Amino acid sequence: MHEQYQPLEIETQAQNYWKEHQSFLVRELPDKEKFYCLSMFPYPSGKLHMGHVRNYTIGDVISRYHRMQGRNVLQPMGWDAFGMPAENAAMKNNVAPAAWTYDNIAYMKSQLDSLGLAIDWSREVTTCKPDYYRWEQWLFTRLFEKGVIYRKNGTVNWDPVDQTVLANEQVIDGRGWRSGALIEKREIPMYYFKITAYAEELLESLDNLPGWPEQVKTMQRNWIGKSRGMEIGFPYDQASIGHAGQLKVFTTRPDTLMGATYVAVAAEHPLATQAAQNDPQLQAFIDECKRGGVAEADIATQEKKGMATSLFVEHPLTGDKLPVWVANYVLMNYGEGAVMAVPGHDERDFEFANKYGLPIRQVIAKVEGDDDFESSVWKEWYGAKDESVLTVNSGKYDNLGYQAAFDAIGADLEAKGLGQARTQFRLRDWGISRQRYWGCPIPIIHCEACGDVPVPADQLPVVLPEDVVPDGSGSPLAKMPEFYECSCPKCGQPAKRETDTMDTFVESSWYFARYACPQFEGGMLDRKAADYWLPVDQYIGGIEHAILHLLYARFFHKLMRDEGLVGSDEPFKNLLTQGMVVADTYYRTTANGGKDWFNPADVEVERDAKAKVVGARLKSDGQPVEIGGTEKMSKSKNNGVDPQSMIDQYGADTCRLFMMFASPPDMSLEWSDAGVEGANRFLRRVWRLAHAHVSAGLPGALDVAALDDAQKQVRRAIHLAIRQASQDVGQHHKFNTAIAAVMTLMNVLEKAPNQDAQDRALIQEGLETVVLLLAPITPHICHVLWGQLGHAEAVIDARWPSVDESALVQDTLQLVVQVNGKLRGHIDVAASASREDVEAAARANENVLRFTEGLSIRKVIVVPGKLVNIVAN
């Protein structure tokens, strides 16, 4: 055993052993309890960042711990390999996205291996490979035939110069990010998953996920957005509209119907189109609305604009004429593309009515207090629907609470055939068509005679050609007759293959299930293997995936269940959302007001007595730089630390130890070079103690019955550490406090007596415990030390240590003694001592006698096992 800790040598040795022995290869063992631990798979961007390292280390620690508990553990890894960054990189470097992607995968895989992750690489999936996406296409055809996938027109951002559809984030100030062209809203045919058909189940089954953070479940509940309300029909004013009909609106507040003063429709609504026929100004406004963003977030923050039409509808209860306005905040794809406006009690309508001088009618008032209604100032209570308000100015519906008004107005509307109670969801169907190249081809053939025909199963996969270099204009597949020209599977006539590809969220919605049977060729999933492994016992990923990815994966799991592919209802039993990795930022302001960001490694800092950074200068020129505070590690702020350089300098174990020790996994982790050095120092201490112990020759067995008091204290420290770490790692995932418990134990072992065989046998037990408790966290050093401590089997196959409760029993206890709440000494008493004996010992303590001299003792407070406080005056 080398005297010095040499991480490179140690880590190579451990990794070679795992490779040679296929230590991480796993099979279904029906008689063994399984544990499926999964970290969200990465996009192969080129190299790992610290966020990846943290995510995968957390997963690896949990996996290795459960393996030590005797479970059959699956920890797979793969690549979320389709997507826009590959297309952008391809255009920049003039290389096919496939080649760029596969090169990145090879490099990132070597980085993951260097971290020592216990991954079963035989189950690797790469989503851009046909053997993966063929099953996605197969499921698509099944769902299309059932109507769970359908085609309809959808509104998109269209770049007229690049002839392509842009994602919302690619539209900057209304212009295309690449071409700079003014973006248009366009209606194009798109494919949709009918996720709304599962809205109720997706909402209700959140209650069956006690292992998920409440915050994530709340975010999903809000996104699904179930609301109870009414669909109300406003009869057309035939004099202005020219024919009979109804404008249908959905509202959650029918109790305020008597306050409706106008209605607003979306730019795409048929009434808007009709009104604009002889009104060029209105047509210009409608065109402007259509050019706006299509994202709800954009619409929520943009300035509310509208224009009156010459059309009217009738109030369903009073018959009053209400003007029809076109407004940019009304979405055609929400409800019927129309809203009833009650400016008195809806903040958005209030703002709009004040802007355009529309009537504002109060129909709700506070029950108590003198807070008057003012039509010029919005107050929070205007929108209330609790016991604090009642209806007013509502005729026969006056003096009613929310529910009573809802019911009374609802009953009258239903009687007139102008309303019905309805439950609505905020959730929209999932549009998955993308006019992109680097994605999974949609398996549909368009035939003039037969319509949209799914590609038959025996003709799948529809393979994406991998040698294409996109140029950014239009869809490359739409320019490739060799791809799209085909014959109709139904009638044999010439037909055209669909050239859109699927949203990349589709691939990440079922990958967790394919890991159960990645080589299975008989179907999307091998039901037996899928039911053995699923659901995932522990899923780990960032909170930023709380809604879309996690909701789509839950939806897909239910689709697969309904296809008979899996037996469970939910994909992920427990969810851990790890915090971000943050680091200091430094910058200089440029002449044009921008910022040049400098990497912390290139900056020299000055700290105050509390180690806070108070000054910074660039190493290269010695000139000051501004301190930007701590931010998430990112390329844009240039504050990332390359994991590879850390591994090369300190070794993977140091990197892993720092990551797990610096903060609990669900909190942000602040990068600290000093913290990394501290982690490395600790591992050197462990190595040093083990080296000294092993060099003296391994001891014989420990005789637990023959321990003296000092030895009992050492053994107690060993088993306290086991108890603490078992709770922290196994139950709470608080790896930082588990590591702290091992550090405390190391302090005891370094000071422990080392005189005789019993002492040495005790240190042996202590070192074995240190190695076993650290094995999931720092597996390489523990692999080598376990062998050096005399074990033939590798630590990867060792069991987690169990607590010897008898070692925790103390014959004597040391209690703190206070006088008037101030520490004045310690006393040793028998563990079985009565309260009277403890009080007598405390009163007899020489310090107590000194500090109570001349005082009378009023009372003595005894906290069993901890302290005695003597109150005297």
UniProtKB/Swiss-Prot annotation:
<keyword id="KW-0067">ATP-binding</keyword>
<dbReference type="InterPro" id="IPR025709">
    <property type="entry name" value="Leu_tRNA-synth_edit"/>
</dbReference>
<feature type="binding site">
    <location>
        <position position="635"/>
    </location>
    <ligand>
        <name>ATP</name>
    </ligand>
</feature>
<dbReference type="InterPro" id="IPR014729">
    <property type="entry name" value="Rossmann-like_a/b/a_fold"/>
</dbReference>
<dbReference type="GO" id="GO:0004823">
    <property type="term" value="F:leucine-tRNA ligase activity"/>
</dbReference>
<keyword id="KW-0963">Cytoplasm</keyword>
<comment type="similarity">
    <text>Belongs to the class-I aminoacyl-tRNA synthetase family.</text>
</comment>
<dbReference type="GO" id="GO:0005524">
    <property type="term" value="F:ATP binding"/>
</dbReference>
<dbReference type="InterPro" id="IPR001412">
    <property type="entry name" value="aa-tRNA-synth_I_CS"/>
</dbReference>
<dbReference type="GO" id="GO:0002161">
    <property type="term" value="F:aminoacyl-tRNA deacylase activity"/>
</dbReference>
<keyword id="KW-0436">Ligase</keyword>
<keyword id="KW-0547">Nucleotide-binding</keyword>
<protein>
    <recommendedName>
        <fullName>Leucine--tRNA ligase</fullName>
        <ecNumber>6.1.1.4</ecNumber>
    </recommendedName>
</protein>
<dbReference type="InterPro" id="IPR009080">
    <property type="entry name" value="tRNAsynth_Ia_anticodon-bd"/>
</dbReference>
<dbReference type="Pfam" id="PF08264">
    <property type="entry name" value="Anticodon_1"/>
</dbReference>
<feature type="region of interest" description="Disordered">
    <location>
        <begin position="624"/>
        <end position="643"/>
    </location>
</feature>
<dbReference type="InterPro" id="IPR013155">
    <property type="entry name" value="M/V/L/I-tRNA-synth_anticd-bd"/>
</dbReference>
<keyword id="KW-0030">Aminoacyl-tRNA synthetase</keyword>
<dbReference type="Pfam" id="PF09334">
    <property type="entry name" value="tRNA-synt_1g"/>
</dbReference>
<dbReference type="Pfam" id="PF13603">
    <property type="entry name" value="tRNA-synt_1_2"/>
</dbReference>
<dbReference type="GO" id="GO:0006429">
    <property type="term" value="P:leucyl-tRNA aminoacylation"/>
</dbReference>
<dbReference type="InterPro" id="IPR002302">
    <property type="entry name" value="Leu-tRNA-ligase"/>
</dbReference>
<dbReference type="GO" id="GO:0005829">
    <property type="term" value="C:cytosol"/>
</dbReference>
<feature type="short sequence motif" description="'HIGH' region">
    <location>
        <begin position="42"/>
        <end position="52"/>
    </location>
</feature>
<dbReference type="InterPro" id="IPR015413">
    <property type="entry name" value="Methionyl/Leucyl_tRNA_Synth"/>
</dbReference>
<feature type="short sequence motif" description="'KMSKS' region">
    <location>
        <begin position="632"/>
        <end position="636"/>
    </location>
</feature>
<dbReference type="Pfam" id="PF00133">
    <property type="entry name" value="tRNA-synt_1"/>
</dbReference>
<keyword id="KW-0648">Protein biosynthesis</keyword>
<dbReference type="InterPro" id="IPR002300">
    <property type="entry name" value="aa-tRNA-synth_Ia"/>
</dbReference>
<dbReference type="InterPro" id="IPR009008">
    <property type="entry name" value="Val/Leu/Ile-tRNA-synth_edit"/>
</dbReference>
